[in-house]
Amino acid sequence: MASCVVRDWQGKEAGKATLDLKVAKETTAVDLMHRAVLRQQAHARQGTASTLTRSEVRGGGRKPYKQKGTGRARQGSIRTPLKPGGGIIFGPKPRTYNLAMNRKERRLALRTALMARIDDVTVVQDFGASLEAPKTREITDALGRLGVAAGSKVLIVLTNPSDVVRRSVRNLEKVKLISADQLNVFDLLHANALVLGEEALATIQEVYGDD
């Protein structure tokens, strides 16, 4: 079980919150999270790269020149891989890069990653509730009040992000906003700082704390 300080929108301490999630053993935790990240990155690949073999390249049916008597090496087609414009030898073809990982392992890796970053977590009451209109400056000022260093990669996790908050955040290159039920290992490990809404903490405990 881990304890976190809850802060209000002004950055002042407003209480305590706890998070109790089952994590992997220390001896297997790094390998488990590594496999989860590899799987996530592999699933993000389109796998649509494709080249033509010599049999698929248009043309090349006619023999370029006669077999003998020219003094040159014999050629049977202008689409041989040895010539510019010819086919590609062992080139890429459409494929899937998906890696298998069972659900129990995926959830364990996610919980382990979150608990490993618990010291970088800031819990905020009613994140962005006072915003009446989208304003990026309000978000950057709030992050500063919460102790997030300027230029840091920040992951904001909310239960149901409002449209105002989404539009306020989307212009910040190093700030990413996701829903509490859409957590993933890569984002948790990639960010320098994690900002969680107080209600998101309860959602995380509910969604990921059953195992």
Swiss-Prot record:
Query: Where are the annotated segments for Disordered?
Result: 41-86
SUPFAM superfamilies, per database record = Ribosomal protein L4 (SSF52166)
The signal sequence is: none
Which cellular components does GO assign to this protein? ribonucleoprotein complex; ribosome
**Gene Ontology terms describing biological process:** translation
The answer to whether keyword tRNA-binding applies is no
InterPro entries, sorted: Ribosomal_uL4 (IPR002136), Ribosomal_uL4-like (IPR013005), Ribosomal_uL4_dom_sf (IPR023574)
Give residue spans, biased composition: Basic residues: 60-71
> What are the entry keywords?
Ribonucleoprotein, Ribosomal protein, RNA-binding, rRNA-binding
Superkingdom in the source lineage: Bacteria
**Recorded GO terms, molecular function?**
rRNA binding; structural constituent of ribosome
Describe the function of this protein: One of the primary rRNA binding proteins, this protein initially binds near the 5'-end of the 23S rRNA. It is important during the early stages of 50S assembly. It makes multiple contacts with different domains of the 23S rRNA in the assembled 50S subunit and ribosome.
Per the record, the similarity remark reads: Belongs to the universal ribosomal protein uL4 family.
Q: How does it assemble?
A: Part of the 50S ribosomal subunit.
What is the protein name for this chain? Large ribosomal subunit protein uL4
Record the organism. Answer: Synechococcus sp. (strain CC9605)
> In the UniProt record, what gene is named as encoding this protein?
rplD
